[in-house]
């Protein structure tokens, strides 16, 4: 492409401006498991629905997770229609069917498996990170009103399988080595069972990854205003580590395969402004979030574009960005 090159005219047609490039999924995602690793999120949500018992007894013993749907995981920029489903208002005697009215985002980390394991062969906690290829940013969209009606007794179904969005970049665990951090557990909490415990995990099991959510409404776009930040948190505040997720997932002999993906669960910090969902920021819809342009939100509206990003940064190490993950909500048909 040097000026005057004989091949310049031919090669110039191969160049595409970055703004015009369309990303594809970084791999074919196999099985998908979503965890629930933020104790701050679990406690905050629990207080809204079970004020006398916000954190269930198993939370501090087990890395809670459930199997999700990989077919609806899309790349950043994949807009989606507002989902429909059954909901039941608190005062209603019967459920009704229609578009979700309490659509929410969830700020998560996506974890990609590199090398799998054979069926019946658990992965030990000290070997767990050898099976992790890398990490991305993940938005696990949630239909809260559909979820509230359907989730008993087996957990979420239609409230989660309509759309999930990942960033186009997978940052390898090798690149993240300078940002590994100490993992601790409160002395008053139950200490991990032996298969979830190791000196290595205590020393460097966490990842220091800053996470941020921004919102761009249709009105903001019309006025050519930039998106507004909603919250910022950090993955190092997670109650369970990546290695513990892998070790727990396979301790019964479950086999993982290359391209499998874990979701970390919503990553909220200890402070209210570090909430990783609208459910928390709006106190389950009872306290509208005020935006700089005068708009308010309790949950997401049609035309809203949710943007998430993540980065690692500290003195003495190269800054690492995870790119953006964003998608716009289209009206239900």
Regions flagged by a language model, labelled:
Residues 31-38, 255-265:
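Conserved phosphate/anionic-ligand binding catalytic regions in large, soluble enzymes, centered on
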Residues 239-248, 257-258, 262-311, 316-325:
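Active-site pocket scaffolds in enzymes
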Residues 329-331:
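Interdomain boundary/hinge segments at the C-termini of tandem beta-sandwich modules
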């Amino acid at each position: 492409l040097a000026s005057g090159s004989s091949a310049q005219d031919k090669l110039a047609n191969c160049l595409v401006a970055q703004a015009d490039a369309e990303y594809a999924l970084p791999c074919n995602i196999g099985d998908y498991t979503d965890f629930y690793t933020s104790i701050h999120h679990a406690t905050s949500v629990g207080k809204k629905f079970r004020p006398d018992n916000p954190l269930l007894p198993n939370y501090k013993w087990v890395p809670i997770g459930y199997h999700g749907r990989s077919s609806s995981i899309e790349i950043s920029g994949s807009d989606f229609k507002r989902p429909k489903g059954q909901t039941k208002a608190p005062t209603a005697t019967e459920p009704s069917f229609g578009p979700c009215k309490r659509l929410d985002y969830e700020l998560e980390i996506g974890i990609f498996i590199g090398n799998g394991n054979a069926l019946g062969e658990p992965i030990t906690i000290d070997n767990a990170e050898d099976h992790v290829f890398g990490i991305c940013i993940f938005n696990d969209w949630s239909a809260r009103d559909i979820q509230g009606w359907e989730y008993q007794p087996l957990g979420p179904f239609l409230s989660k399988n309509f759309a999930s969005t990942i960033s186009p970049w997978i940052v390898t665990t090798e690149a993240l080595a300078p940002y590994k951090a100490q993992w601790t557990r409160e002395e008053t909490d139950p200490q991990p069972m032996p298969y979830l415990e190791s000196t290595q995990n205590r020393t460097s099991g966490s990842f220091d990854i800053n996470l941020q959510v921004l919102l761009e409404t249709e009105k903001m776009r019309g006025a050519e205003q930039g998106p507004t930040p909603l919250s910022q948190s950090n993955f190092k505040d997670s109650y369970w580590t990546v290695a513990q997720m892998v070790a727990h997932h396979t301790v019964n002999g479950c086999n993982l395969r290359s391209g499998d993906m874990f979701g970390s669960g919503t990553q909220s910090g200890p402070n209210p402004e570090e909430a990783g969902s609208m459910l928390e920021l709006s106190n389950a819809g009872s306290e509208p979030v005020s935006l700089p342009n005068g708009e308010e939100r309790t949950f997401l509206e049609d035309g809203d574009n949710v943007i998430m990003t993540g980065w690692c940064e500290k003195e003495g190490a190269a800054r690492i960005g995870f790119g953006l993950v964003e998608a716009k909500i289209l009206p239900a048909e």
